[in-house]
């Protein structure tokens, strides 16, 4: 996507940090690619997360700590998908926001809530799997669930504390040919922005990644030790399930979140080194990389149901049962409606024949 965007625009030429620098010169390509991408994210994310939520609600009496963290991931993603139609319209219009600054702030709030709630709950899932495998006797099931409830509340409070200030500052900006919303250039005048973003990247990405990797390495060590001591444990499948969950979380985390945060860190270091004076071509390249990496990061919304699929016991069986039930209901409805339609057609035909014969008399 980024290569395609890069090949379909003429690099803008202007003085560094100049007002003549068009950072949205790639809008003709972006207005096609980005709405298609986000439409796909909207459909897959909404259907997948709603399906997961239905399964959770139907089995709420059997909830455990893993299910609880996964539930919060699902709720965060459903909230995010509700804001996508406005973003799709924004990108389709070539980065032009025409529905007011208030709605721009709200969509920005939802976007950042989803991003960092997702990161935090993925971290919680990794820690939960770590406790279940490495220290299974330290916390019993009841204590773990009660502890998980408190952690979930704390995570939401933390995320809202980080994102609510977005409602205070304007998120839209009048450009020469458009009104932009939630774009990086809208924040460039913020004092100490590079340090703020570097700090946010450390807290919201680097630290969770370190925790996830530590949990993963400890779980691997534990599984290998257990397999050596008792080969029968491999047949139970419990350790394999825990390993699959952690591997999936790491893959999703790295693929979705790493490119965006690396792009931010790299650009902020450049700004600090060159005292905020960057060439227009450098700023434009960064803007394109942001649009691409944000698309990749938001695809996380579609991957979270798969995390739930692997992490939660019996989810696959319950989903397949629901789908089979739905198909059988559809087939039975079609079978029942067929005789009714045939009898209705026969009645109408008989009435027409009777009417014609009466007219003939």
UniProtKB/Swiss-Prot annotation:
Result of altering residue 297 to I = Reduced localization to the cell membrane and reduced receptor function. Reduced oxysterol agonist-binding
Report what the protein is called.
G-protein coupled receptor 183
Effect annotated for changing residue 104 to A? Abolishes localization to the cell membrane without affecting protein expression levels
**How the protein is affected by changing residue 181 to A?**
Abolishes localization to the cell membrane without affecting protein expression levels
Q: How the protein is affected by changing residue 90 to A?
A: 10-fold reduction in receptor activation. Strongly reduced localization to the cell membrane
The residue ranges for the Cytoplasmic side of the membrane come to 58-77, 128-149, 216-241, 313-361
Region described as Interaction with G proteins = 126-134
**Extent of Polar residues compositional bias:** 348-361
